[in-house]
């Protein structure tokens, strides 16, 4: 009896695909209908995003909540990231959009881990910011030049422009501290609290206008006071410096 050779072209033969012949599943869809926005807050896997086109939301405010799509993997999303989202972008209560893409970052501010298993590693903090506003008091608490130096290094490493804002200039002369940083080309501004408000706040406002800014500085230097003056709706809680701890 002659042997019959039935090739794989025969319609009666069903070939089960092996790993090598299976279609690739890691190709990400284009999501041509995605809309873009900036991450403004992150809370336990939920991302608050302000859309570039606020009119897409029901209230016109432009703020929505999204979850990260599985296809993005474990990549770190940080505040300031420009992202693309699909799904429900109405911004209505209890609705979730889906974040499907993280756009390339212009700048990335990193912070060094100080303890635990990740000590010595760097953690991304903020993306796409233009200014790193280093807030330091001239007194009560006294300035910390070494901390200022670390902030300046972080700003330059991130590709950001540093801005040194000196608070409480009514309590100490800023000349000595300014002499350390003005020769480096660091822009320095001084403010003080008066009975009518904060003297110098308008100059700070102009320096920040049209830019994405990050405020840093240790406890008690007046960051919250500055934020409340610049953004009254922020309603940040302010306090007094403890005479014992200096905080």
Regions found by a protein language model. Give the residues of each.
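Walker A/P-loop
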Residues: 219, 224-225, 229
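Short flexible coil/turn linkers enriched for glycine and charged/polar residues
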Residues: 33, 41-43, 93, 127-130, ...
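Canonical P-loop GTPase G-domain recognition
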Residues: 168-221
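Histidine-anchored nucleotide/phosphate-binding helix
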Residues: 146-156
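Conserved beta-strand/loop subsegment of P-loop NTPase cores
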Residues: 128-136, 157-169, 185-192
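N-terminal accessory targeting/assembly segments
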Residues: 1-142
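Switch I (effector-binding) loop of TRAFAC-class P-loop GTPase G-domains
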Residues: 232-247
């Amino acid at each position: 009896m002659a042997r019959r050779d039935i090739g794989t072209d025969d319609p009666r033969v069903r070939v089960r695909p092996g790993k090598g012949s299976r279609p690739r599943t890691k190709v990400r869809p284009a999501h041509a209908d995605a809309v873009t926005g900036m991450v403004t807050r992150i809370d336990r896997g939920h991302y608050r995003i302000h859309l570039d086109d606020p009119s897409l939301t029901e209230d016109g405010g432009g703020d929505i909540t999204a979850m990260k799509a599985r296809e993005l993997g474990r990549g770190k999303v940080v505040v300031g990231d420009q992202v693309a989202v699909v799904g429900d972008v109405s911004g209505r209560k209890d609705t979730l959009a889906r974040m499907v893409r993280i756009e390339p970052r212009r700048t990335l501010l990193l912070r060094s881990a100080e303890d635990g298993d990740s000590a010595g590693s760097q953690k991304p903090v903020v993306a796409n910011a233009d200014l790193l506003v280093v807030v330091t008091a001239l007194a009560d608490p006294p300035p910390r030049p070494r901390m200022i130096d670390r902030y300046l290094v972080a700003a330059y490493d991130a590709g950001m422009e540093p801005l040194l804002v000196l608070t409480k200039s009514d309590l100490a002369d800023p000349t000595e501290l300014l002499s350390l940083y003005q020769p480096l080309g660091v822009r320095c501004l001084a403010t003080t609290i008066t009975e009518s408000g904060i003297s110098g706040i308008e100059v700070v406002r102009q320096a920040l206008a049209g830019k994405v800014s990050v405020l840093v500085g240790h406890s008690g230097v007046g960051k919250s006071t500055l934020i409340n003056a610049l953004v009254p709706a922020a309603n940040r809680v302010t306090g007094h410096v403890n005479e014992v701890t200096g905080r």
